[in-house]
C-alpha cells in the first residue's frame, strides 16, 4: 500500500469513473485500475462495484475511503508542520473565497503571491460566505476571504485585507453628475446578484431596496456573477452596483458608465478569516500581508478613509 494508491482511490470515489479519475491523477486508466485492483487484493475488500454506471463505492469501500482521506490529511499536516518548524514558507493552503472577490484577486494578486512563493501550493474553492463558514468549522479549508463584519465570524480569527468602494455602473443619462444618491435613481432595471450573495445584501442596503424607496419592475431578476451584471447594463441599460476592483478591469468606454455615490461613499471590508491559529499561520500571515501591500496604493478608500462608510454584508 502506498500514498499514490490512496490518492487514486479518492479520485475514483469522487468522479465515479476510472477514466476521469485517471485524467485527474495524470496517469493512464490501465495504470490506475491496476493499482486499485492491487490494493483491493491486498486488503481483501471490494472497494468499488464496477458493474454499475456510474461506478458505485461499496459500503466497505466507504469506510476505506474515509480512512484514506484521513491518512492523506495527516501526511499533508506532517509535511506542513515540518516546513513550519524549519521556518520555510512551504506547504498547502486550502482557501475559500467569495465569488465577487475571487475573479479579481486570483488572476492578479494571488497569482503574483504564488509566483513569488513557489513552494506554497494553494487550492482555491469559490464559495458563498455561509459555505466558507461551514467549511472552516469542518476543517475542509484552512482560511476564507469574505466581506466583514459578519455575525458568524465572532468565534474566528480575522485579518483585515482591504476596503474597496462600491460604485454605480449605469446607463444614467445625466453625464454631468459625478456623484449620485439613491434618491436620484430613475430606472426600472436594477440588476442584482442572486440571493445568498453578500454583495446583493449590500446593494439592497445602499439603495434602500428593502424599504421599497426604489422598486424596479424586474427586481426578481438575479445574476450569478458580476460579469453578468455588467453585460446586462451594457446590453439593456439600467443600474447595478460594482466593487471597485471590478471597475478596474473595465474598458475605457465602460468606465464612462461608472459613478460614485454621494458621501459618505459606501464601501465593503474584505478580510481573511480562519478558525484557529495553526502551523500554517506563517503562510497565512505572509499571504495576508502580500494582499494588503499589493492593493494599498490602488484603492480609493486608502486616499481618505473618513469619506467612506463600511456597509455590512447582512
Ranges and model annotations:
Residues 40-59:
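A short LG(V/I)-centered, amphipathic sequence patch enriched
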Residues 110-117, 140, 200-216:
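Ligand-binding cleft/hinge of the Venus flytrap
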Residues 153-159, 163-164, 227-277:
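Beta-alpha-beta core module
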Amino acid at each position: 500500500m502506498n500514498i499514490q494508491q490512496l490518492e487514486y482511490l479518492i479520485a475514483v470515489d469522487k468522479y465515479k469513473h476510472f477514466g476521469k479519475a485517471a485524467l485527474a491523477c495524470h496517469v493512464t486508466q490501465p495504470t490506475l485500475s491496476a493499482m486499485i485492483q492491487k490494493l483491493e487484493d491486498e486488503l481483501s475488500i471490494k472497494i468499488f462495484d464496477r458493474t454499475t454506471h456510474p461506478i458505485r463505492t461499496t459500503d466497505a469501500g466507504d469506510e476505506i475511503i474515509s480512512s484514506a482521506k484521513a491518512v492523506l490529511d495527516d501526511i499533508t499536516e506532517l509535511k506542513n508542520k515540518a516546513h513550519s518548524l524549519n521556518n520555510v514558507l512551504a506547504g498547502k493552503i486550502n482557501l475559500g473565497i467569495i465569488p465577487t472577490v475571487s475573479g479579481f484577486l486570483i488572476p492578479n494578486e494571488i497569482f503574483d503571491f504564488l509566483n513569488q512563493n513557489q513552494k506554497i501550493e494553494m487550492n482555491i474553492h469559490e464559495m458563498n460566505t455561509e459555505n466558507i463558514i461551514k467549511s472552516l468549522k469542518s476543517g475542509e479549508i484552512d482560511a476564507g476571504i469574505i466581506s466583514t463584519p459578519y455575525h458568524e465570524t465572532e468565534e474566528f480569527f480575522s485579518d483585515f485585507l482591504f476596503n474597496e468602494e462600491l460604485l454605480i455602473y449605469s446607463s444614467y443619462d445625466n453625464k454631468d453628475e459625478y456623484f449620485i444618491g439613491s434618491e436620484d435613481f430613475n430606472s426600472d432595471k436594477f440588476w442584482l446578484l442572486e440571493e445568498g450573495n453578500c454583495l446583493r445584501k449590500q446593494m439592497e442596503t445602499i439603495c434602500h431596496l428593502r424599504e421599497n424607496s426604489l422598486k424596479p419592475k424586474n427586481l426578481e431578476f438575479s445574476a450569478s456573477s458580476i460579469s453578468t451584471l455588467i453585460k446586462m447594463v451594457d446590453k439593456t441599460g439600467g443600474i447595478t452596483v460594482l466593487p471597485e476592483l471590478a471597475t478596474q478591469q473595465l474598458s475605457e468606454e465602460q468606465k464612462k458608465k461608472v459613478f460614485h455615490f454621494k458621501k459618505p461613499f459606501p464601501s465593503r471590508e474584505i478580510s481573511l478569516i480562519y478558525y484557529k491559529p495553526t502551523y500554517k499561520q506563517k503562510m497565512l500571515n505572509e499571504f495576508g500581508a502580500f494582499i494588503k501591500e499589493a492593493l494599498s496604493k490602488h484603492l480609493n478608500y486608502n486616499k481618505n478613509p473618513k469619506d467612506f462608510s463600511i456597509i455590512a454584508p447582512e
